[in-house]
Protein backbone atom coordinates (compact mmCIF):
# COMPACT_ATOMS: atom_id res chain seq x y z
CA UNK A 1 0.00 0.00 0.00
CA UNK A 2 3.03 2.28 0.18
CA UNK A 3 3.45 2.98 -3.53
CA UNK A 4 -0.19 2.77 -4.57
CA UNK A 5 -2.16 5.50 -6.32
CA UNK A 6 -4.75 5.67 -3.56
CA UNK A 7 -2.21 6.67 -0.89
CA UNK A 8 0.76 8.44 -2.50
CA UNK A 9 4.03 8.89 -0.66
CA UNK A 10 5.50 12.20 0.46
CA UNK A 11 8.73 13.48 -1.03
CA UNK A 12 11.52 13.19 1.56
CA UNK A 13 13.30 16.30 0.33
CA UNK A 14 11.84 19.76 0.62
CA UNK A 15 12.22 22.23 -2.23
CA UNK A 16 14.28 25.33 -1.48
CA UNK A 17 12.31 28.66 -1.43
CA UNK A 18 15.17 30.29 -3.39
CA UNK A 19 14.57 28.10 -6.45
CA UNK A 20 12.52 29.14 -9.45
CA UNK A 21 8.86 28.19 -9.52
CA UNK A 22 8.80 24.49 -10.22
CA UNK A 23 6.30 21.77 -10.79
CA UNK A 24 6.52 18.07 -10.19
CA UNK A 25 5.76 15.82 -13.10
CA UNK A 26 4.89 12.16 -12.79
CA UNK A 27 6.99 10.15 -15.23
CA UNK A 28 4.68 7.16 -15.33
CA UNK A 29 1.47 9.04 -15.92
CA UNK A 30 -0.88 11.13 -13.82
CA UNK A 31 -0.41 14.63 -12.50
CA UNK A 32 1.18 15.44 -9.18
CA UNK A 33 -0.93 16.39 -6.26
CA UNK A 34 -0.12 19.66 -4.50
CA UNK A 35 0.01 19.43 -0.73
CA UNK A 36 -1.34 22.39 1.19
CA UNK A 37 1.06 23.56 3.85
CA UNK A 38 3.67 26.12 4.66
CA UNK A 39 5.42 25.73 1.32
CA UNK A 40 3.03 25.40 -1.64
CA UNK A 41 5.84 23.98 -3.80
CA UNK A 42 6.20 20.85 -1.67
CA UNK A 43 4.57 18.22 -3.84
CA UNK A 44 3.35 14.71 -3.31
CA UNK A 45 3.20 12.15 -6.09
CA UNK A 46 2.50 8.47 -6.40
CA UNK A 47 5.67 7.26 -8.14
CA UNK A 48 9.10 8.49 -9.23
CA UNK A 49 9.10 12.20 -10.03
CA UNK A 50 11.05 14.68 -12.09
CA UNK A 51 11.43 18.32 -11.06
CA UNK A 52 11.42 20.71 -13.97
CA UNK A 53 12.41 24.38 -13.64
CA UNK A 54 10.17 26.81 -15.41
CA UNK A 55 10.95 30.22 -16.83
CA UNK A 56 9.62 33.33 -15.20
CA UNK A 57 7.46 33.95 -18.30
CA UNK A 58 4.66 31.76 -17.01
CA UNK A 59 3.31 28.25 -16.97
CA UNK A 60 2.72 28.26 -20.74
CA UNK A 61 6.43 28.08 -21.58
CA UNK A 62 6.95 25.27 -19.13
CA UNK A 63 3.96 23.42 -20.51
CA UNK A 64 5.31 23.78 -24.06
CA UNK A 65 8.74 22.44 -23.06
CA UNK A 66 7.23 19.55 -21.13
CA UNK A 67 7.12 16.27 -23.14
CA UNK A 68 3.95 14.30 -23.46
CA UNK A 69 3.27 11.77 -20.74
CA UNK A 70 3.29 8.10 -21.78
CA UNK A 71 0.02 6.22 -21.49
CA UNK A 72 -0.48 4.43 -18.17
CA UNK A 73 0.33 0.73 -18.14
CA UNK A 74 -2.43 -1.70 -17.24
CA UNK A 75 -1.98 -3.18 -13.78
CA UNK A 76 -2.40 -6.82 -12.93
CA UNK A 77 -5.50 -7.76 -10.99
CA UNK A 78 -4.81 -8.11 -7.32
CA UNK A 79 -3.96 -5.97 -4.34
CA UNK A 80 -2.73 -2.50 -5.32
CA UNK A 81 0.96 -1.83 -4.77
CA UNK A 82 2.06 -5.48 -4.75
CA UNK A 83 4.76 -6.49 -7.19
CA UNK A 84 4.59 -9.69 -9.08
CA UNK A 85 7.41 -12.09 -8.21
CA UNK A 86 9.67 -13.20 -11.08
CA UNK A 87 9.08 -16.72 -12.35
CA UNK A 88 11.13 -19.25 -10.43
CA UNK A 89 13.45 -21.63 -12.22
CA UNK A 90 14.14 -25.06 -10.82
CA UNK A 91 17.76 -25.87 -10.08
CA UNK A 92 19.12 -29.31 -10.81
CA UNK A 93 20.46 -31.54 -8.06
CA UNK A 94 24.08 -30.56 -8.70
CA UNK A 95 23.37 -26.82 -8.29
CA UNK A 96 25.13 -25.91 -11.54
CA UNK A 97 22.18 -24.27 -13.27
CA UNK A 98 18.51 -24.45 -14.13
CA UNK A 99 17.20 -27.87 -14.89
CA UNK A 100 15.30 -28.89 -18.01
CA UNK A 101 11.69 -27.86 -18.48
CA UNK A 102 10.44 -31.41 -18.02
CA UNK A 103 7.81 -31.82 -15.27
CA UNK A 104 8.85 -32.93 -11.83
CA UNK A 105 7.21 -36.32 -11.91
CA UNK A 106 8.93 -37.16 -15.20
CA UNK A 107 12.44 -36.35 -13.95
CA UNK A 108 11.78 -38.05 -10.63
CA UNK A 109 10.69 -41.20 -12.40
CA UNK A 110 13.84 -41.35 -14.55
CA UNK A 111 16.77 -43.39 -13.38
CA UNK A 112 20.32 -42.08 -13.18
CA UNK A 113 21.25 -43.62 -16.52
CA UNK A 114 18.28 -42.05 -18.35
CA UNK A 115 18.88 -38.66 -16.74
CA UNK A 116 22.54 -38.79 -17.70
CA UNK A 117 21.58 -39.69 -21.25
CA UNK A 118 19.16 -36.76 -21.31
CA UNK A 119 22.01 -34.37 -20.49
CA UNK A 120 21.57 -34.00 -16.72
CA UNK A 121 24.46 -34.08 -14.24
CA UNK A 122 24.23 -36.13 -11.09
CA UNK A 123 26.19 -35.35 -7.91
CA UNK A 124 27.45 -38.94 -7.98
CA UNK A 125 29.21 -38.18 -11.26
CA UNK A 126 30.90 -35.16 -9.72
CA UNK A 127 32.10 -37.17 -6.73
CA UNK A 128 33.46 -39.92 -8.98
CA UNK A 129 35.27 -37.40 -11.14
CA UNK A 130 36.82 -35.71 -8.11
CA UNK A 131 37.91 -39.04 -6.62
CA UNK A 132 39.43 -40.13 -9.92
CA UNK A 133 41.35 -36.86 -10.16
CA UNK A 134 42.80 -37.25 -6.66
CA UNK A 135 43.70 -40.89 -7.35
CA UNK A 136 45.36 -39.95 -10.64
CA UNK A 137 47.47 -37.27 -8.94
CA UNK A 138 48.66 -39.64 -6.22
CA UNK A 139 49.57 -42.41 -8.64
CA UNK A 140 46.51 -44.60 -8.18
CA UNK A 141 44.53 -44.62 -11.40
CA UNK A 142 40.87 -45.64 -11.73
CA UNK A 143 41.75 -49.00 -13.42
CA UNK A 144 43.96 -49.95 -10.48
CA UNK A 145 41.21 -49.03 -8.03
CA UNK A 146 38.69 -51.14 -9.93
CA UNK A 147 41.11 -54.08 -10.02
CA UNK A 148 41.81 -53.81 -6.29
CA UNK A 149 38.23 -53.57 -5.15
CA UNK A 150 36.75 -55.88 -7.78
CA UNK A 151 33.25 -55.78 -9.16
CA UNK A 152 31.64 -56.82 -5.87
CA UNK A 153 33.84 -54.94 -3.44
CA UNK A 154 36.70 -56.02 -1.18
CA UNK A 155 35.03 -59.35 -0.36
CA UNK A 156 35.49 -60.68 -3.89
CA UNK A 157 38.68 -62.35 -5.01
CA UNK A 158 41.39 -64.16 -3.14
CA UNK A 159 43.21 -63.38 0.08
CA UNK A 160 45.89 -61.28 -1.59
CA UNK A 161 43.31 -59.11 -3.33
CA UNK A 162 41.40 -58.57 -0.08
CA UNK A 163 44.61 -57.64 1.73
CA UNK A 164 45.63 -55.15 -0.95
CA UNK A 165 42.11 -53.73 -0.99
CA UNK A 166 42.19 -53.29 2.79
CA UNK A 167 45.54 -51.49 2.57
CA UNK A 168 44.17 -49.31 -0.20
CA UNK A 169 41.09 -48.45 1.87
CA UNK A 170 43.19 -47.27 4.83
CA UNK A 171 43.58 -43.47 4.97
CA UNK A 172 47.15 -42.61 4.19
CA UNK A 173 49.11 -39.65 2.94
CA UNK A 174 49.45 -41.20 -0.53
CA UNK A 175 45.74 -40.80 -1.24
CA UNK A 176 45.69 -37.10 -0.37
CA UNK A 177 45.96 -34.77 -3.33
CA UNK A 178 49.37 -33.13 -3.52
CA UNK A 179 47.73 -29.83 -4.38
CA UNK A 180 45.73 -30.03 -1.15
CA UNK A 181 48.91 -30.75 0.79
CA UNK A 182 50.72 -27.77 -0.69
CA UNK A 183 47.82 -25.40 -0.09
CA UNK A 184 47.17 -26.59 3.46
CA UNK A 185 48.45 -24.97 6.63
CA UNK A 186 51.52 -27.23 6.58
CA UNK A 187 53.93 -26.16 3.79
CA UNK A 188 55.97 -28.86 2.04
CA UNK A 189 59.11 -29.70 3.97
CA UNK A 190 62.46 -28.67 2.52
CA UNK A 191 64.87 -31.43 1.48
CA UNK A 192 67.46 -32.13 4.12
CA UNK A 193 71.13 -31.65 3.43
CA UNK A 194 72.96 -34.90 2.55
CA UNK A 195 75.90 -33.83 4.72
CA UNK A 196 73.72 -33.52 7.80
CA UNK A 197 74.34 -30.83 10.37
CA UNK A 198 77.17 -28.39 9.98
CA UNK A 199 80.15 -29.72 11.87
CA UNK A 200 81.79 -27.41 14.38
CA UNK A 201 85.49 -26.69 14.21
CA UNK A 202 87.78 -27.34 17.14
CA UNK A 203 90.34 -24.92 18.54
CA UNK A 204 93.05 -26.13 16.16
CA UNK A 205 90.82 -25.54 13.13
CA UNK A 206 90.15 -29.19 12.26
CA UNK A 207 86.62 -30.50 11.82
CA UNK A 208 85.35 -32.56 14.70
CA UNK A 209 83.59 -35.74 13.71
CA UNK A 210 80.13 -36.14 15.31
CA UNK A 211 80.78 -39.86 15.91
CA UNK A 212 83.80 -39.22 18.14
CA UNK A 213 82.88 -40.60 21.51
CA UNK A 214 84.96 -42.18 24.22
CA UNK A 215 84.83 -45.91 23.64
CA UNK A 216 82.58 -45.67 20.60
CA UNK A 217 83.23 -47.29 17.26
CA UNK A 218 83.69 -44.03 15.38
CA UNK A 219 87.31 -43.81 14.17
CA UNK A 220 88.32 -46.56 16.56
CA UNK A 221 87.35 -44.59 19.61
CA UNK A 222 90.21 -42.16 19.12
CA UNK A 223 88.75 -38.69 19.52
CA UNK A 224 89.07 -35.73 21.86
CA UNK A 225 87.16 -37.57 24.58
CA UNK A 226 89.32 -40.66 24.24
CA UNK A 227 92.50 -38.59 24.48
CA UNK A 228 91.25 -36.84 27.61
CA UNK A 229 90.36 -40.17 29.17
CA UNK A 230 93.81 -41.59 28.43
CA UNK A 231 95.48 -38.57 30.01
CA UNK A 232 93.23 -38.92 33.05
CA UNK A 233 94.14 -42.56 33.58
CA UNK A 234 97.84 -41.79 33.26
CA UNK A 235 97.58 -39.00 35.82
CA UNK A 236 95.66 -41.24 38.23
CA UNK A 237 98.32 -43.92 38.03
CA UNK A 238 101.08 -41.38 38.69
CA UNK A 239 99.54 -40.13 41.95
CA UNK A 240 100.58 -42.13 45.04
CA UNK A 241 97.78 -43.69 47.05
CA UNK A 242 95.10 -42.84 44.53
CA UNK A 243 91.80 -44.64 44.69
CA UNK A 244 91.53 -47.57 42.32
CA UNK A 245 88.33 -46.91 40.41
CA UNK A 246 88.79 -49.81 38.02
CA UNK A 247 86.49 -52.82 38.26
CA UNK A 248 87.64 -55.91 40.12
CA UNK A 249 89.95 -58.11 38.08
CA UNK A 250 90.68 -55.43 35.47
CA UNK A 251 94.18 -54.89 34.20
CA UNK A 252 96.11 -51.70 34.83
CA UNK A 253 96.13 -50.69 31.18
CA UNK A 254 92.41 -51.39 30.69
CA UNK A 255 90.77 -48.17 29.58
CA UNK A 256 87.28 -49.48 29.01
CA UNK A 257 84.57 -47.33 30.59
CA UNK A 258 82.88 -48.52 33.73
CA UNK A 259 79.69 -50.45 33.22
CA UNK A 260 76.56 -49.76 35.19
CA UNK A 261 76.21 -51.93 38.27
CA UNK A 262 79.88 -52.87 38.64
CA UNK A 263 81.31 -52.84 42.18
CA UNK A 264 84.07 -50.34 42.95
CA UNK A 265 86.93 -51.31 45.27
CA UNK A 266 88.04 -48.23 47.16
CA UNK A 267 90.98 -48.06 49.59
CA UNK A 268 90.37 -47.56 53.26
CA UNK A 269 91.22 -43.85 53.15
CA UNK A 270 88.73 -43.12 50.39
CA UNK A 271 85.74 -44.61 52.18
CA UNK A 272 83.22 -42.28 53.69
CA UNK A 273 82.25 -42.66 57.36
CA UNK A 274 79.02 -44.60 57.44
CA UNK A 275 77.16 -47.21 59.43
CA UNK A 276 79.59 -49.91 60.50
CA UNK A 277 77.21 -52.24 62.30
CA UNK A 278 75.26 -54.99 60.62
CA UNK A 279 71.78 -54.37 59.39
CA UNK A 280 69.20 -54.56 62.17
CA UNK A 281 71.64 -54.12 65.06
CA UNK A 282 71.71 -50.88 67.10
CA UNK A 283 74.95 -48.92 66.96
CA UNK A 284 77.02 -48.22 69.99
CA UNK A 285 77.99 -44.74 71.13
CA UNK A 286 81.66 -45.09 70.23
CA UNK A 287 81.24 -46.37 66.67
CA UNK A 288 82.05 -44.35 63.59
CA UNK A 289 79.16 -42.60 61.90
CA UNK A 290 76.88 -42.61 64.92
CA UNK A 291 77.69 -39.17 66.27
CA UNK A 292 74.71 -36.90 66.98
CA UNK A 293 74.27 -33.95 64.70
CA UNK A 294 75.03 -30.48 65.99
CA UNK A 295 71.73 -28.66 66.20
Swiss-Prot record:
Give TM regions.
none
Which cysteine pairs are joined by S-S bonds? none
Q: Which residue intervals are annotated with compositional bias (Basic and acidic residues) in the record?
A: 245-257, 280-295
Quick one: where's region Disordered? 1-111, 183-295
Q: Where is the composition biased (Low complexity)?
A: 57-67
Q: Which residues form the signal peptide?
A: none
Q: Name one Pfam family in it.
A: DUF5555
For bias type Pro residues, the affected ranges are 68-77
Which InterPro entries does UniProt cross-reference here?
DUF5555 (IPR040791)
Q: Which domain of life is it from?
A: Eukaryota
Comp. bias intervals (Basic residues): 1-13
Indicate what this protein is called per its UniProt record. Answer: Uncharacterized protein DOCK8-AS1
Q: Which organism is it from?
A: Homo sapiens
- What broad taxonomic lineage does this protein's source fall under? Eukaryota, Metazoa, Chordata, Craniata, Vertebrata
